[in-house]
């Protein structure tokens, strides 16, 4: 059971996990772990399933998925019958009213929908993956010089599950560098997997870029793929000025993660998010929601 903190009710909700039995089998059973290492974590598995989700055959999965996870389609720009395949539905866009944004210069917004963890005063060699597991930022981006700039800063981990809106956005106005790609495996980013695979973020396929924001300084953006996420699509134009809330890119089918690193003393994350992280809980947030300030 995965409990997520609800900021509105100030209580904990139980996360509905797509494919829970499969995840438990793959990461907690001896046979499942063997199958995971031999096949599931490999590119071929995600590519095969991705091809299916890109085909018209996958269209029949859409309504059942919406019904099972109670997805509010009134927020979407398309009707159910307008989607060409499951990936088209998965990467759906929302109406502008669905995710209101506070454009105040001192307000930090969430880059996407998901479950947020916040870690302050980070040690580059011991960045927290999940309680009890750490990794090296230098290894994550394979660039020690850039990594060193974020010593003592803040790390935000936004975990997306398959039921979420899967587009990610810029948290401020500014310009972003070209995204650098790092090949890797396709482990799940579900907490069950994070508790069973050390340095998972450093092992998975990922991309990173530097966002020079107007109000929060230099921000390191990292997008991490996961099982069945064969593609991370960047839709922004490198070095072209963007506005706060504009789309940066999106993930195709599967759970996935966006990680942001801020330099020391550039932001202050909302206290409820920080406190829940210390207690070992993620906080549910939506794109555009206020999560901190200067």
From Swiss-Prot:
Primary localization class, coarse: membrane
Keyword Lyase: yes
MF terms in GO: phosphatidylserine decarboxylase activity
List of catalytic residues: 113 (charge relay system), 169 (charge relay system), 256 (charge relay system), 256 (schiff-base intermediate with substrate)
Annotated Gene Ontology cellular component terms: plasma membrane
EC category: lyase
Chemical reaction(s) catalysed: a 1,2-diacyl-sn-glycero-3-phospho-L-serine + H(+) = a 1,2-diacyl-sn-glycero-3-phosphoethanolamine + CO2
Residue numbers marked as site, Cleavage (non-hydrolytic): 255-256
Post-translational modification note: Is synthesized initially as an inactive proenzyme. Formation of the active enzyme involves a self-maturation process in which the active site pyruvoyl group is generated from an internal serine residue via an autocatalytic post-translational modification. Two non-identical subunits are generated from the proenzyme in this reaction, and the pyruvate is formed at the N-terminus of the alpha chain, which is derived from the carboxyl end of the proenzyme.
Single GO BP term: phosphatidylethanolamine biosynthetic process
Assembly and interaction partners: Heterodimer of a large membrane-associated beta subunit and a small pyruvoyl-containing alpha subunit.
Family affiliation: Belongs to the phosphatidylserine decarboxylase family. PSD-B subfamily. Prokaryotic type II sub-subfamily.
Protein name: Phosphatidylserine decarboxylase proenzyme
Gene: psd
